[in-house]
Amino acid sequence: MKTNIITKIKILIKATNIFKNWYLYPFVYFKILRRDYVIFETYSGLKIKLRTRSTDLMALTNVWLVEEYSNFRINDKDVIIDIGAHIGLFTLYASQYCTNGIIFCFEPVEENYSVLLDNITQNNLKNVKPFKSAVSKSESTIAIYRNKDEASHSMFDPTSHALKVDSISLKRIIDENS
């Protein structure tokens, strides 16, 4: 998605209102930062770890700055199922509103799952239950086709490298947690 300069400036301004260390945003965006990871801290105290040499910043921008989920009504006692949780950006966003409910997050790819666990742990999110698993129509081992950006893996794109992962059915998730 091409973004014009005005939109980019608005996004940076929004970052100054959400993140205490917003000044790191352009360093990650322009790939100037020499670290593998960065942790953004919100004014509300959430810490968000992401990889600097990936599309994690784009995902952070979509969830936290563009606010793709702002029209979702998330209530205090909701049960949320985050399928393809990636590094937990939506999970962290939802955790601000769903404080007495439960958030189940499913991420089958080890590199993403590891950062997801870090994000859950460093924020002491007791109501978040992570699973290193894909979600599909049945209990099985399935192929996930890896995308080089670590954010767009798919069960339906056989043009890229396949990774075999465990899968749980949505029916089982609901049956076991109802």
Predicted regions and their residues:
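Phosphate/nucleotide-binding beta-alpha loop and adjacent structural elements of enzyme active sites
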Residues: M1-S178
